[in-house]
């Protein structure tokens, strides 16, 4: 069993991007065969937001590449057609958290849309929201179109106050994910925004002390050059890719830049931290409907002081 931690360990601020993958062929794993499948793993030349471990000596910030969270561990949102309000549906059985005492809310996604809209149209930033300002590790993810293609995903494993953290990572994920061009105002109507709060950090007893579909994992290891590296997958990645634990670990090692053959003994040397997440997603259409309703009825926090509903 893992050793429970209430918050992530004290460390430099971590920024993580997320990326889509194809089903993997994990070469060099030694004792584990995965068939004739292929994977796309970011290279070390992709730029600082995609590097598996990049330290900016001037700021102490460490950037760790990551994958996006998937829907399986997330409360699903729906629009109440009578009131225009957003409400989370219950989580499916077996997911990481129940709907009881959830911190994440659809209003957090609305605030992210506020921030992005104001930036893209040159308006002053929106007033502070009314949801909790407690500190959490967090991710902001943007997807686009009917097939919800990834358009940007950046987050931090350091606990940040939600008001400033969501504001910062809204713009970072939308404009500075080096895998994509910056989002534009023309793309707004097709966007989906997800906010993920990371919780329940635990030191695992070994590299298999976690559950696929329940836990996200962050590993630390020493590469073939004697350099400590880190890499992480958010809670839904392994389940969405149909990986078992060893496939996930091996993929994560490759993602972290480990190029040598992966052996059972090397896997045992990994330090693994597991965690869970709360996630909510809304579309731009839901955001607009919710903002109109809230403005008309004086509930939640008012939309930015401009008319963007025409």
Swiss-Prot record:
UniProt feature, compositional bias: Polar residues: 28-66, 74-84
Keyword ATP-binding: no
InterPro entries to which the protein is assigned, alphabetical: AMMECR1, AMMECR1_dom_sf, AMMECR1_domain, AMMECR1_N
Domain AMMECR1 intervals: 97-291
Keyword field: Phosphoprotein
Modification Phosphoserine occurs at: 74
Residue numbers spanned by region Disordered: 26-92
Annotated transmembrane regions: none
Protein origin, superkingdom: Eukaryota
Protein's UniProt name: AMMECR1-like protein
Organism per entry: Mus musculus
């Amino acid at each position: 069993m893992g050793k429970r931690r209430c918050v992530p360990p004290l460390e430099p601020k971590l920024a993580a991007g997320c990326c889509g993958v194809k089903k993997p062929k994990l070469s060099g794993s030694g004792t584990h065969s995965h068939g004739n499948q292929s994977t796309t793993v970011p290279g070390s030349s992709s730029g600082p937001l995609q590097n598996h471990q990049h330290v900016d000596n001037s700021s102490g910030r460490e950037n760790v590449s990551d994958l996006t969270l998937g829907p399986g561990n997330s409360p699903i949102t729906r629009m109440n057609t009578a009131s225009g309000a957003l409400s989370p549906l219950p989580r499916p059985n077996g997911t990481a958290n129940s709907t009881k005492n959830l911190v994440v809310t659809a209003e957090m996604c609305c605030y992210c849309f506020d921030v992005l809209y104001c930036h893209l149209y040159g308006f002053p930033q929106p007033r502070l929201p009314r949801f909790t300002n407690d500190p959490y590790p967090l991710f902001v993810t943007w997807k686009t179109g009917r097939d919800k293609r990834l358009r940007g995903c950046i987050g931090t494993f350091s606990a940040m106050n939600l008001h400033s953290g969501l504001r910062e990572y809204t713009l970072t994920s939308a404009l500075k994910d080096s895998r994509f061009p910056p989002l534009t105002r023309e793309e707004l109507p097709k966007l989906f925004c997800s906010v993920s709060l990371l919780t329940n950090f635990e030191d695992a007893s070994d590299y298999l002390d976690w559950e696929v579909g329940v836990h996200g994992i962050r590993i630390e290891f020493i590469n073939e050059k004697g350099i400590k590296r880190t890499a992480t997958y958010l809670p839904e990645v392994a389940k969405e890719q149909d990986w078992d634990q060893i496939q996930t670990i091996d993929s994560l090692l490759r993602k972290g830049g480990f190029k040598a053959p992966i052996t059972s003994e090397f896997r045992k040397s990994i330090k693994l931290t597991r965690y869970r997440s709360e996630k909510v997603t809304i579309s731009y259409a839901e955001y607009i409907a919710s903002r109109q309703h809230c403005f008309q009825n004086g509930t939640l926090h008012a939309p930015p002081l401009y008319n963007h509903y025409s």
